Amino acid sequence: YAWAIMRIASGLCVAGCYTVIESWLQAKVTNETRGRAMGTYRFVDTFASLIAQLLIGILEPAQYVSYNLLALVCCATLLPITLTTIKQPETPVAPRLRPKLAIHRSPLAVAGVLVAAISGAAFRMVGPIFGAQVGLQVEQIAYFLSAFVFGGALAQYPVGWLADKYDRRWVLIWLSVAAIFSSISSISISSDGSLSIFILAFGFGFTTFPIYSVAAAHAHDFANSDERVELSASLLFFYALGAIAAPLFASSLIGFFGPNAMFIMIA
């Protein structure tokens, strides 16, 4: 129970950090540069999570030193915040969570955020089960998940550039189509010693990770200056809903229909 409580508390803190970061960032950029700004931000975020994932193979998760290192990293991140002289964005007098705000500003963005959450959470949480059922070894499962995150990190800025150059709605549509083809292609993969399973994981991450960035940029295109915090919180709320539901459905489908059911669900 103590572990569950701490996990809930850490989730609340992380959600708060993302809300502040994204609302501040969205308030400081223009519609012409919003996609690239979100792409750069998400590249740093995704690449850092990849490094953290790889550190699991170096550090012992159950050891005290691992948590000390994490605490030091969190403390170090406070330095640029405390030293900055940039004025914070405008906020409403009494900000609150308003999921309807995101729906009113851009229903497409809400749909995109849900798709990004479902695909990402299902792969990250249920991907190890999928890897084990198709015959991957423990270290291969780690590389399998890392290929997914690495593909997502590399896609962020190029897709952000496309979202600034072309209509963000069409970028979202083509990303979704590419994600569907990537999911369908992944159905036939098996651990036959080839690189195909890792290439497909890379491609799946490349097509699904940037959906959130483009969707968030599209929603903020229509937001007023005093709505940034509430809109960012609302988008993260929908992301959390998708991230909670996806692993539950994906794990159940895998149990009934086999490992390929995860990609069928995402498609």
Model-derived features with residue positions:
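C-terminal membrane-cytosol helix-exit motif in multi-pass small-molecule transporters
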Residues: 71-91
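Cytoplasmic helix-loop-helix junction between adjacent transmembrane helices
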Residues: 10-43
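Loop-to-transmembrane helix entry/capping segments in MFS-fold secondary transporters
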Residues: 31-41, 138, 223-235
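Structural signature of the two symmetry-related core transmembrane helices
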Residues: 71, 170-185
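Helix-loop boundary and gating motifs at the non-cytosolic
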Residues: 109-112, 121-130, 134, 141
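Intracellular juxtamembrane helix-capping segments at the cytosolic ends
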Residues: 16-29, 209-223
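A membrane-interface helix-boundary motif in multi-pass transporters
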Residues: 58-73, 252-267
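Helix-to-loop junctions at the C-terminal end of transmembrane segments
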Residues: 60, 155-167, 254
